[in-house]
């Protein structure tokens, strides 16, 4: 069966892109990275794409509508069926988001709907929560909204600062994003309003990573 073609949009280091590249290196993984697009020419993620022979493009210095048109053209030429935002730090044109509705996903370093937007780790620490994590969701026009596909939970430990919490969450992101893309590629998801139902699995077995597992791995 042909693998799902994924287009990844990045702005920076591309560590979640690398997690998807690593997953797709397994020939049994049901998705492949067809193209990478960055809005910044200095994004380290472009080097990651180049090193593995993935077509990559820079679309910069354009207004929102022009950026959307150029990006949509690249995605179409690559035969992309799913767009994955991976550390992509530009707000997308509403028409573009609507055109890719239910075919575009994002990963955010908090347990949405808590702590959307910028500095979610800072928000989590200020709120005094005991657990944080990351969320993969289908993209909607409002920032960090849309039906939730999967979440990973990590503990907030005594003495954490933004950097230590971000590092713990990032490790979970690298596990969660390939899982979520797999679920999309295997057509195991059904959107019901603002909920995502996963065929053949009962949450939290598939739709979440267990906090005790993350706690144990963090201390190993």
Q: Where does each model-flagged region fall?
A:
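Donor/substrate-binding cores of folate-linked one-carbon enzymes
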Residues: 23, 86-199
């Amino acid at each position: 069966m042909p693998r799902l073609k994924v287009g990844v949009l990045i702005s920076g280091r591309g560590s979640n892109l690398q997690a998807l590249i690593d997953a797709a290196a397994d020939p049994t993984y049901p998705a492949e990275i067809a193209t990478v697009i960055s809005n910044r020419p200095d994004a380290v993620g472009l080097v990651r794409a180049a090193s593995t022979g993935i077509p990559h493009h820079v679309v910069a210095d354009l207004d929102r509508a022009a950026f959307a048109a150029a990006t949509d053209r690249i995605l179409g030429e690559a035969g992309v069926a799913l767009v994955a935002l991976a550390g992509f730090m530009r707000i997308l044109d509403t028409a573009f988001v609507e055109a890719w509705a239910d075919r575009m996903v994002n990963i955010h370093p908090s347990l949405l709907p808590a702590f959307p937007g910028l500095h979610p780790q800072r928000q989590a620490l200020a709120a005094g929560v005991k657990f944080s994590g990351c969320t993969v969701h289908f993209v909607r026009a409002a920032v960090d909204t849309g039906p939730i596909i999967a979440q990973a939970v990590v503990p907030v430990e005594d003495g954490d600062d933004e950097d230590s919490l971000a590092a713990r969450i990032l490790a979970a992101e690298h596990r969660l994003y390939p899982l979520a893309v797999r679920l999309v590629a295997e057509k195991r998801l059904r959107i019901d309003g603002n909920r995502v139902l996963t065929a053949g699995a009962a949450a939290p077995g598939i739709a979440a990573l267990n906090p005790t597992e993350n706690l144990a791995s963090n201390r190993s």
